[in-house]
Amino acid sequence: MTVQKLVATAVLVALVSLILNNAAAFTPNWVYQTLEDGRKRSVGLWKSCWLVDRGKGGTSPGTRTGQVDTHDCEVLGWGSESAGFQESRGTVKLQFDMMRACNLVATAALAVGQITFILGLTGLPLMSPESQCWEEAMAAAFQLASFVLVIGLVTFYRIGPYTNLSWSCYLNIGACLLATLAAAMLIWNILHRREDCMAPRVIVISRSLTARFRRGLDNDYVESPC
């Protein structure tokens, strides 16, 4: 079974997006916060950790200043207000809850796209590589992932003076761009195929038609393969 290189490349790009999206979700480095007393911590979607230079438990042996102390972390969940500290707790809670929801939806959508690709390779009637529905289903899944990630990331366009975006956030931006690229590649391939099939039929008229009408005259014509 031959799979088009463009489709395979788009699925590979979406797989990288899925990996980056999960890496951004489960690392406590979404934002860095600095308190008035000088303490610093890194906050992720599901966990927050104090930095070892001024953490509550002091510097751990063998660690460098500015590193995350994995022994002094707090699990965060839906509606956690501790992510705010000196910032507006309600605003920060809404930002992180929105991002958690969008991250989960994007993960599910990207996973569905990968499963759809695998099912197509098995030769199912509705999901075969020759079926246009196969590419459309993957494109819709990847586009949904891109859309919800944009919604979640937009909520962080405004942050407080004590908060700075960290590398996990930028990692998720990369995942969003890759999901968009994967969807765009599939959509371009679908539209390109449709343009080929929507071309007008090519009809070759026999020269004998210019002669007088005779019974039994056959018309020669050639139609496009689509």
From Swiss-Prot:
Q: Where in the cell is it found?
A: Cell junction, Adherens junction; Cell membrane
Q: Give the membrane topology.
A: Multi-pass membrane protein
Q: Which InterPro entries does the annotation name?
A: TMEM204
Keyword list (alphabetical) reads: Cell junction, Cell membrane, Glycoprotein, Membrane, Transmembrane, Transmembrane helix
Q: Give the PANTHER family listed for this entry.
A: TRANSMEMBRANE PROTEIN 204
Instruction: Describe the function of this protein.
Output: Can influence paracellular permeability. Appears to be involved in cell-cell interactions through adherens.
Q: What is this protein called?
A: Transmembrane protein 204
Q: Which organism is it from?
A: Rattus norvegicus (Rat)
